[in-house]
C-alpha cells in the first residue's frame, strides 16, 4: 500500500518549475508503473513532462477525468523541514506535492478492480507559468482519452482539515497579464517643453484606468485591475522617454475579462493620443480562464461530500486568484473544489506547510467520489 506521507515528502524535496519537471515525472512514472503492474486495463502516455494514465472501463459509457498539477514555484523554501526542497530556489509552496500524492492514492484505489466507465488520471505540468492544460489540449495530448467530465482540487491553507469548499458557479477568476509601455521624448528637466514626458502620461493612465472597474464593470460581477510595477526614468533631472507598467486583470467570467481587457487597451491608447505619444499594450491571458464549475455536476459533487462522515462541506465565494484548470473546464464539463490543509501561511509563502493528515482524508473522499462516477 502506498505510503502517502513518505510519497508527499519525496515529492516535496524535488520541486521543479513548469515544463522542467523531469525528476518529478520520473518519480511519478516509477510509482505508477509499480501500481499498475499486472493491470491489463491500464495504458500510460507521456506528453513532455506530463503523464496520462487511462483505465479502460469494462462497459464504458463515458470517461471520467481527474487532474492534478505537478510543478513547483521559483521560491526559496524557509520551512526548516527535514524533507525541505533539495532544489535551490524551488519549492512546492502551492501544495502540488499534496495534489500529486492524493492523485496517486486515488489511482491505487481505482486499480483495485476494473471500473465500469473509463477513468483518466492526468498529471499536468506547468500550471503556474505556462498553462500546461491548454498546451496539452492544443497539442492533442488527450486524443481519444479526452474525458466527458473533469474533476480536480486545490489545497487551501485557511480551511481546516476535513473541510471541502466549492460552489455551483465560478471558483477561480480568469487572469490576464498586462504590459504597457508609453513612448514619448526624453529631455532635460529644465526644458519640459522640448520633451514629451512618458512618466506623466503613464501616471495619468494609472489613475484613469481605475474608472474601468468603477464605471464599466457590473458591480454585481466584479473585476480587478492592478498594476504592481511602474518603471520610468533613471535620474532626477532628466525627463524619461519611456514608462513601463506591468499588471494584472482578474474577472469571474470570460466575457467580463474580455470587456476589461478591451477597456484597458482603449484607455491606454486614449491617454497616449492625448499626450501625442506612442503606446504598446500587451495582453496575455493564455490558458488562465475562469474556473467555471458546471452547475449540475457541482451540485452532485457537493451533495455527495455533504453526506460523507468527517467532511464539512462549505459553499464558498469565488476567489480572484487564477488556475489554469479553467481552460480544460472551458472544453469539458467539470468541477474544481478546495481541500482544507490548515496552514497559518498562505499559498506561495516560503513557510507554507500543510498538515499531512489531510492526505488520507483527501484520498478517501476523492476516491469514493471517483468510484461512484466510474460505476454510473
Curated annotation (Swiss-Prot):
Pfam families: M20_dimer, Peptidase_M20. The keyword Hydrolase applies. SUPFAM superfamilies: Bacterial exopeptidase dimerisation domain, Zn-dependent exopeptidases. Its EC number is 3.5.1.47. GO terms for molecular function: N-acetyldiaminopimelate deacetylase activity. Gene3D superfamilies: 3.30.70.360, Zn peptidases. Pathway: Amino-acid biosynthesis; L-lysine biosynthesis via DAP pathway; LL-2,6-diaminopimelate from (S)-tetrahydrodipicolinate (acetylase route): step 3/3. CDD domains: M20_Acy1_YkuR-like. InterPro entries: AcetylDAP_deacetylase, Amidohydrolase, Bact_exopeptidase_dim_dom, Peptidase_M20, Peptidase_M20_dimer. Keywords: Amino-acid biosynthesis, Diaminopimelate biosynthesis, Hydrolase, Lysine biosynthesis. It catalyses: N-acetyl-(2S,6S)-2,6-diaminopimelate + H2O = (2S,6S)-2,6-diaminopimelate + acetate. The active site is at residues 69, 128. Belongs to the peptidase M20A family. N-acetyldiaminopimelate deacetylase subfamily. HAMAP family: DapEL. Catalyzes the conversion of N-acetyl-diaminopimelate to diaminopimelate and acetate. This is N-acetyldiaminopimelate deacetylase. It comes from Streptococcus pneumoniae (strain CGSP14). The lineage of its organism: Bacteria, Bacillati, Bacillota, Bacilli, Lactobacillales.
Amino acid at each position: 500500500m502506498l505510503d502517502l506521507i513518505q510519497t508527499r515528502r519525496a515529492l516535496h524535496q524535488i520541486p521543479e518549475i513548469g515544463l522542467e519537471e523531469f525528476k518529478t515525472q520520473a518519480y511519478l512514472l516509477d510509482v505508477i508503473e509499480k501500481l499498475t503492474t499486472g493491470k491489463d486495463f491500464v495504458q500510460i502516455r507521456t506528453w513532455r513532462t506530463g503523464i496520462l494514465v487511462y483505465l479502460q472501463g469494462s462497459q464504458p459509457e463515458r470517461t471520467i477525468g481527474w487532474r492534478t498539477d505537478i510543478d513547483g514555484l521559483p521560491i526559496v523554501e524557509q520551512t526548516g523541514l527535514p524533507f525541505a526542497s533539495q532544489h535551490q530556489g524551488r519549492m512546492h509552496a502551492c501544495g502540488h506535492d499534496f495534489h500529486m500524492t492524493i492523485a496517486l492514492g486515488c489511482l491505487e484505489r481505482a486499480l483495485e478492480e476494473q471500473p465500469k466507465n473509463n477513468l483518466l488520471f492526468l498529471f499536468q505540468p506547468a500550471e503556474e507559468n505556462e498553462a500546461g492544460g491548454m498546451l496539452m489540449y492544443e497539442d492533442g495530448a488527450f486524443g481519444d482519452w479526452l474525458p466527458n467530465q473533469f474533476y480536480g482540487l486545490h489545497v487551501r491553507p485557511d480551511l481546516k482539515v476535513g473541510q471541502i469548499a466549492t460552489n455551483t458557479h465560478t471558483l477561480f477568476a480568469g487572469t490576464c497579464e498586462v504590459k504597457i509601455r508609453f513612448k514619448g521624448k526624453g529631455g532635460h528637466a529644465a526644458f519640459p517643453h522640448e520633451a514629451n514626458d512618458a512618466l506623466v502620461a503613464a501616471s495619468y493612465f494609472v489613475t484613469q484606468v481605475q474608472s474601468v472597474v468603477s464605471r464599466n464593470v457590473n458591480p454585481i460581477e466584479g473585476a480587478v485591475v492592478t498594476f504592481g510595477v511602474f518603471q520610468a526614468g533613471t535620474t532626477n533631472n532628466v525627463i524619461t522617454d519611456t514608462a513601463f507598467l506591468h499588471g494584472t486583470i482578474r474577472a469571474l467570467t470570460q466575457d467580463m475579462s474580455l470587456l476589461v481587457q478591451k477597456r484597458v487597451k482603449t484607455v491606454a491608447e486614449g491617454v497616449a493620443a492625448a499626450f501625442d505619444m506612442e503606446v504598446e499594450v500587451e495582453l496575455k491571458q493564455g490558458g488562465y480562464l475562469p474556473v467555471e464549475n458546471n452547475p449540475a455536476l457541482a451540485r452532485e459533487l457537493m451533495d455527495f461530500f455533504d453526506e460523507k462522515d468527517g467532511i464539512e462541506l462549505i459553499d464558498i465565494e469565488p476567489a480572484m486568484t487564477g488556475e489554469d484548470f479553467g481552460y480544460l473546464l472551458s472544453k469539458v464539463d467539470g468541477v474544481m473544489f478546495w481541500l482544507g490543509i490548515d496552514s497559518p501561511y498562505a499559498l506561495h509563502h516560503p513557510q507554507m506547510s500543510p498538515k499531512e493528515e489531510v492526505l488520507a482524508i483527501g484520498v478517501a473522499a476523492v476516491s469514493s467520489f471517483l468510484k461512484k462516477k466510474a460505476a454510473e
